Regions:
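C-terminal and inter-domain tail/linker signature
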Residues: 1-142
Length: 142
C-alpha cells in the first residue's frame, strides 16, 4: 500500500462527500467496515454505513465539507474537516428547523489490505451541533 494509493482512496471519499453520494461514500468502506461517530454511534457494515450517509444528507441536504491535507502513516489516515449545513429534514427526532450549523472535526481512518476503510472514527463537537439546530440548549457559563 503506497501513499499514492491511500491518497487516491481519500480523494474518492472526499469526492463522495462533495457529491453527497451515500453509495459512492459507502463503496470506500470495507463490507464489514465500522464507522464510529457522535451522530450515529457505531455503524457496522457497508449497507448500514450507506444508510447513515443517506440519513445525514436527508437532514442536511446542503451539507458542505472542506478538508485539510490528509496525514498518511501506512494504513492509517487523519484528516481535518469543517462543515456547514442547514438543518432541513428530520434529525434526532427534530423536524427541519432551517437553522444553519457549522463545526470542525477530524476523521481517523484505518484501511484494510484491499485499500478500503475498515474503521472510520469521527471526532467533533456534537453537543455544539445539537445546540445549533435546537435539539439541546446550552447555558452560558457564569
Amino acid at each position: 500500500m503506497t501513499n499514492d494509493q491511500v491518497t487516491a482512496l481519500i480523494d474518492r471519499h472526499i469526492d463522495g462527500w462533495n457529491r453527497r453520494d451515500p453509495t459512492l461514500l459507502a463503496s470506500n468502506h470495507a463490507e464489514d467496515g465500522v464507522v464510529l461517530s457522535p451522530m450515529f454511534a457505531r455503524v457496522r457494515g457497508r449497507a448500514q454505513i450507506r444508510d447513515s450517509y443517506a440519513a445525514l444528507f436527508a437532514a442536511f441536504p446542503d451539507w458542505q465539507m472542506q478538508f485539510g491535507a490528509p496525514i498518511v502513516d501506512g494504513n492509517r489516515v487523519a484528516i481535518a474537516f469543517s462543515v456547514t449545513a442547514t438543518h432541513q429534514g428530520d434529525f434526532m427526532g427534530l423536524a427541519g428547523s432551517g437553522r444553519r450549523c457549522a463545526f470542525e472535526g477530524v476523521s481517523l481512518y484505518q484501511l484494510d489490505a484491499d485499500l478500503l476503510i475498515k474503521e472510520e472514527r469521527r471526532v467533533y463537537d456534537f453537543t455544539g451541533l445539537l445546540a445549533q439546530v435546537g435539539v439541546v440548549r446550552i447555558r452560558p457559563a457564569s
